Amino acid sequence: MPKRRARVTRKTKETDIAIELVLDGNGKYEIQSGIRFLDHMLESFSKHSRIDIALTCTGDVDVDDHHSIEDIAIVLGSAISQALGDKRGIQRYGWAIIPMDESLARAAIDLSGRSYLFFDAVFDRPTVSDLSTEMVEHFFFSLAEHLKANIHLEILHGKNTHHKVEALFKSLAVAMREAVKITSNEVLSTKGVI
């Protein structure tokens, strides 16, 4: 079976982004988002989802991190959606509970073709390194919107903000790895389409 791949670009007055990914990869990554902590989170997402990701972003981070973070989530969601094609044979659902030291995150995803985000996490710090923690929820919202998926994310407990954010990214990565897995040759929907 050929590997499922996608390439997406997005150029606005605020950002210039290119992404190439392979769903059936090994978790290889080359990520340059312009936001060091986001690089770390996307590298973790790639490694634990086993999705190969090459991403570059030039953005107006001198103004704020909002535009780059939002647009990266848009291209990541669009690229995964493109690589999934008609979603024939995918498991469709995935879930994971992942610890990161004292923090515990739960993720569930349905690649349903319908966008929705449930997010329950509280961060005690306004930033982790150069990432605004208020943008974590917005990243996942934009990802769900452009992936056309139901994503549920929550921190069950935790103290360290870095650990909470990383546990969210890793739990979604493991859930995604399960959801994109090919398990049959049928579309997993009574409608016949997803």
Curated annotation (Swiss-Prot):
Protein EC: 4.2.1.19
Source domain of life: Bacteria
InterPro entries: IGPD_sf (IPR038494), ImidazoleglycerolP_deHydtase (IPR000807), ImidazoleglycerP_deHydtase_CS (IPR020565), Ribosomal_Su5_D2-typ_SF (IPR020568)
One of the Pfam families matching this protein, by short name: IGPD
Pathway entry: Amino-acid biosynthesis; L-histidine biosynthesis; L-histidine from 5-phospho-alpha-D-ribose 1-diphosphate: step 6/9
Keywords: Amino-acid biosynthesis, Cytoplasm, Histidine biosynthesis, Lyase
Cellular compartment(s): Cytoplasm
Catalytic activity: D-erythro-1-(imidazol-4-yl)glycerol 3-phosphate = 3-(imidazol-4-yl)-2-oxopropyl phosphate + H2O
One Gene Ontology cellular component: cytoplasm
GO molecular function: imidazoleglycerol-phosphate dehydratase activity
Cystine residue pairs: none
Keyword Transport on entry: no
GO biological process, one term: L-histidine biosynthetic process
Family: Belongs to the imidazoleglycerol-phosphate dehydratase family.
Protein name per the record: Imidazoleglycerol-phosphate dehydratase
UniProt source species: Chloroherpeton thalassium (strain ATCC 35110 / GB-78)
